[in-house]
Amino acid sequence: MKIFLTLILLSSSTLTFADGNNDWQNIDDNIFKLNSLNSCQGCLLRNANFIGADLNNALLSGADFISANLSNSNLYNANLEGSSLFGAEINGSNLENANLFGSNLFAVNLYGSNLAGANLTEADLSHANLSGVNLAKANLTNANLRGADLDGAILDGAFLCNTMMPWGVDNSSCQ
């Protein structure tokens, strides 16, 4: 009887977090909004699954993608300025010409992704997996790559000014 009552109570309840917010519903609504409008600025999208998603030219500034999976996604020319992608999986994705100005990419997995021409000014890429990543002509001014894995990364023509690299500050592109 006790198990039956517990099941009834759980089936009629809604999952909420400690602050009382119904974040699971918000995430579903935000995914619908993103799919409909290709825009979801400041949206909560934590732990969401966007594997293989086409988010070409999407407006996602300030979005919360913490621990989301964006592997093999197309984010060409997407605006992710000020977004939080802490711990996200973005391996094998296309972020060519994406705007990631001031974004939090701490401990993100970008293995094999294309960030050619991306704006990573003031981005936090510390402890990120950037192995095999194409960063050609990317702007890394004031970016933090301390502790990042750059094994096999392509940095041809990348703009490095006051860039905190794993080996220290790189000012090779400053004028």
Q: What is the predicted role of each segment?
A:
Residues 19-175:
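Tandem repeat scaffolds
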Residues 8-10:
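Cleavable N-terminal signal peptides of Sec/SRP-targeted secreted and luminal proteins
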Residues 1-5:
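Positively charged n-region of N-terminal signal peptides that target proteins for export
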